[in-house]
Amino acid sequence: MSGAVDYSEMRFVDLKRKVVFELVREREREALKAFYKRMNETSVRLGCSKKTNFAVAHGMHHDRNYSTALDIATISCNAIRNHPLLADVINTKYYECRSRLLPNHCYKWKNTNDMIWDSSKCYYGVKTGVTQTAGPCLSVHYKSSCGTFDFIIVVLNSKTKEARFLEIPKLVEWAIQKIQRVKKINYKPSLKRQLLRNLAHF
């Protein structure tokens, strides 16, 4: 009959689509598993503790996705030292591009790290983030204008999104005082390393 719908064929097509969809989804799952495994292997290689584990790629909350301020600082330091392109991206204030599929559509991004807008020009990326359990978080690279001080400051579970940016200058001042104190006292190298490690845990 002209115009009649062949439901058996329609169901077969739907079945094929479902099979293809499941195959694609399974490959995606396997790819993500491999990616998580690689992330955790890399974190261990960089010297992160067992208190760090990655279980998602998007950065949102997951019960098996956790870390510490020291480990985040370790990862941040490696990123800016060994990946120049990433260092350039995280310090970009604005970026825009046009879609290949929609040439007239322009995408615009603004860096959410308020510290890179600071007039002192001593702050650089690294990462902002907020989840329900971790709260407002921030990893920042501080480098003094004279080049004397160069370190990473990490804030986790700040009271508000705005508060994390206000806490950074205070932590920088505190860290500089601690570092200067360490330099003035003639500690044994092992004790000095331990004091600096405690500083990173603050």
Question: Which role does the model predict for each range below?
Answer:
Residues 3-201:
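Penicillin-recognizing serine hydrolase domain
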